[in-house]
């Protein structure tokens, strides 16, 4: 798999709980720990350091539909997320 861009999801968990690889973390395996997980996505980076979204109108995670694949890019974090067609926003803000 090609290398992930910064804060691009490296693994997506399927509805059945299977790990679906999306890209690689500069040759390392995609982490499997909670500090790298948001919703059903895992990221190469520790996501706990990503800043909290300031409002519920903000795009928290962009969904990028490529040819035969889908990518997720993290911009800011929420306490809970709301899914839209091409992005996730915050249903509930952190703090």
From Swiss-Prot:
Gene Ontology cellular component?
Answer: extracellular region
Tissue localization of expression: Expressed by the venom duct.
Alphabetical UniProt keywords:
Disulfide bond, Ion channel impairing toxin, Neurotoxin, Secreted, Toxin
Q: Name its cellular compartments.
A: Secreted
Post-translational modification (record):
Contains 5 disulfide bonds.
One term of GO molecular function? ion channel regulator activity
Domain remark text = The cysteine framework is VIII (C-C-C-C-C-C-C-C-C-C).
Report the function annotation for this chain. Answer: Acts as a neurotoxin by inhibiting an ion channel.
Name the chain's protein: Turripeptide OL184
């Amino acid at each position: 798999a090609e290398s992930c861009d910064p804060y691009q999801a490296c693994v997506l968990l399927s509805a059945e709980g299977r790990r679906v690889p999306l890209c690689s973390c500069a040759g390392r395996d995609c982490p499997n720990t909670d500090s790298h997980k948001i919703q059903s996505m895992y990221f190469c980076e520790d996501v706990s350091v990503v800043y909290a979204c300031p409002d519920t109108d903000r795009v928290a995670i962009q969904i990028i539909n490529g040819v035969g694949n889908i990518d997720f890019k993290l911009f800011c974090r929420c306490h809970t997320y709301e899914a839209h067609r091409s992005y996730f926003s915050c249903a509930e803000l952190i703090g």
